[in-house]
Structure formats: structure tokens, C-alpha cells
Amino acid sequence: MALHTVLVINSGSSSIKYQLVDPASGQALASGLVERIGEEMGAITHKHDEAKTVIEAPVPDHRAGLAKVLELFESEGPSLAEANIAAVGHRVVQGGRYFDGPALVNEAVENRVEALIPLGPLHNGPALAGIRVARQLLPDVPHVVVFDTAFFQGLPEASARYALNREVADKYEIRRYGAHGTSHQYVSSTVSQLLGRDDLKQIVLHLGNGASASAVVNGRAVDTSMGLTPLEGLVMGTRTGDIDPAAVFHLARVAGMDAQELDHLFNRESGMKGLCGDNDMREVWKRIDAGDTQAREAMDIYIHRLLKYVGSYTAVMGGLDALTFTAGIGENDAAIRAELCARLGWLGVELDEQANNQRSPEPRVVSTPDSKVKVLVVPTNEELAIARQAMTLV
């Protein structure tokens, strides 16, 4: 058993993801997922060593869900009493302008996370619920919050400030906050270590069901695609990404949609799902291979948006040394990497086809030795990053 471990918790509106991490070795000692919180019957999956336990039970709220998780640690292992937990790390999406790093949880921090719910309505409320029940159930362990927005706190004003009326923007705290910052920081740092250089101009593409891009110069973020909320930027699984804000006014006027309906449309029924009915890229590729023109068009739109961001960020940074793919799609979809890189020859990008098609859990370079821009695939590990940040405060 590790000398010190961190229990990392990511609370969603109807789920709790968790992982027991040894920050020193990077090893995940156990992990699991509580699903369908608040429904008639919930499900809990717990993995430890090679064993996987799945149970179904009523999970009326987050407290009941986390209590079930703690029971599973004791019955299935590893015992938390023997794991020497140094901290509980909580992922919180929106830290506003108040948090540029991890923070020890106290009443004031809880209150600030709650006050930021209007800026992160889909994420901060569930995260706060998880924090509160975890502090009740594990009262003798320090709790640390790690914010998705923290890595982007230092964005230049030219990137962070919208061209919205200054008084209105400041009053309602409307600016670019970004998201996935923990992943972007972890991945860009890993690239620097892998290439043995800190003086890099990097673009990181975090491509999962949620997707974001970042421009990183010498380890500091200078731009990112997600904005006030995670809705802005790239085409995503179910989110629009960039869209003319007037579409909101138009739909309100002609379709009679209210704010809740528009929020649902833009966040849950758009993106790849809205374009072709599928937000699973594996299914999209199957349909493309079968000659489905709607799926092909959706993929073209997806790649086009990526291309725009790579080009604009290269201009913002005045060059590009490394282009990195991460997260579920970025790490596993060789075809998307190939299609994007095929259109970046003007940057001197040369993809090594064999390296690109090879699956590996390790960080790796997938460009040719002659490529002027290093292209990499780096598996993200947000849980490890959260655990290591938590350990800096305990």
C-alpha cells in the first residue's frame, strides 16, 4: 500500500466518479463510478486490482452514493483505514477569478464555489454537493478543491476579455475562463518533459465528448477555446461550440424557446449528435465508411473547426513547436489525427502513419523525424494531476 494516497472525487449531477491515487507513483489503486443518482435504482461499479464489483441499489442522493462507495472500499478493498489518505481532492469546473490554484476547503471556499454556480450551472452545483457530503463522511481528512479554470487564470486580457460592454461584463463577471485546465496543464507539462524543453509553443487538443484547445507558451496558457462556460469553442459531442450569439435571440423570437430550452438545445442536442445523430465517433466513422453523407459532413465540420483553432493559435503564438492530442478521442482516434494533420502540411507537419496507428498507453511522438512540428499523443490523467495538486497543500 502506498505511503500516502489521495481520494479524488468528481461529482456530476447524477453521478460520482472516484479514484484512489498514489501521487508518488502515479498508480490508481482503485476506481469507480456511481450512476443514476436520484433515479429509482442506481448502479455502483468499483474496481480494485483485477477485480470489478457491480451492484445495483437505490441511490437517492450524493450522500447515499458516497456512503455506498466507502462501504465498497471496506468490503472489496483497498481498506481506506490502511490506505493512509492524506487528502480528498475534488474537481470543480468553475473557479471564476478567485482561484488560480488548488485551495483547502473551508466554509469560505464552499461559499465561493456556491456563489459561482451562476457561471457554472451545469457543474458547480453537483461538485458542491459532493464536497459537502464528502466532508461529512470523511471529516478527519483535509479536502482540497482543484479548479478546471485555474490554469487559465493568467490569460492575457486580449484573450480573456470579450468585446462586450465593459461595465456589464465586469458587473456580471463575463470573460473567458476556459475549462479542462487541469488536463491542459498536465499534458503540456508532460510534453515539455518528453521533449526535454520548457521553451515551447504548444497547442493541446483535448478531444473527448467535451473538447477544448489551448495555446501554451513556455508553460503558460495564452489562449483557450472554452469561454465563459464550456459551451464555446470546438465542435463537441453534444455542444455547438462557436455559434453566432444572435442564434439565441432568433430562436427565442421565432421558436418561442426560453432560456432552459435553449441551454438544453445548445449543450445536449447539438454538436456531433445534432449534426448526424451520433456523438460516438466510432459510430460516426462506421457510417462514413458505409457512405453516409450526413456523417461525413459532420466530420468535415468537426475537422474544419479544429483546423481554424490550430491556425489561429499558431498566429497568436508566432509559431508552433508541438501539437498534442489527448482525451478519449484525441488519444484513440488515429483517423481524426490523420485528417487534421494532412491539412497542416503548410506548417511543416509530417505525421508518421505507422506511429499514428499504433495504440499505446504511453506518451509518444507520432510525427516523422523531419516534421517541423512535433505531433504527440499524450494520455491525460486528471485524477493524478488533482491528487498531486492536493498534496501541495497538505
Please state what every model-predicted region is:
Residues 6, 15-59, 227:
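Short glycine-rich, Thr/Ser-proximal phosphate-binding strand/loop in the N-terminal lobe
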Residues 12, 90-95, 207-209, 320-332:
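Glycine-rich beta-strand-to-loop/alpha-helix junction loops that act as flexible
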Residues 71-86, 191-196, 310-321:
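Phosphate/pyrophosphate-binding loops at sites that engage ATP/ADP/AMP, CoA/4′-phosphopantetheine
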Residues 73-123, 144, 150-159:
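Short beta-strand-loop/turn "lid" adjacent to the catalytic site in phosphate-handling enzymes
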Residues 151-254:
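Glycine-rich phosphate-binding loop of actin/hexokinase-like ATP-binding domains
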Residues 217, 223-255, 264, 327-358:
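Catalytic phosphate/nucleotide-handling subdomain of diverse soluble enzymes
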Residues 255-298:
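A mobile "lid/hinge" subdomain adjacent to the ATP/sugar-phosphate binding pocket shared
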Residues 296, 300-316, 330-394:
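Internal helix-turn-beta structural module
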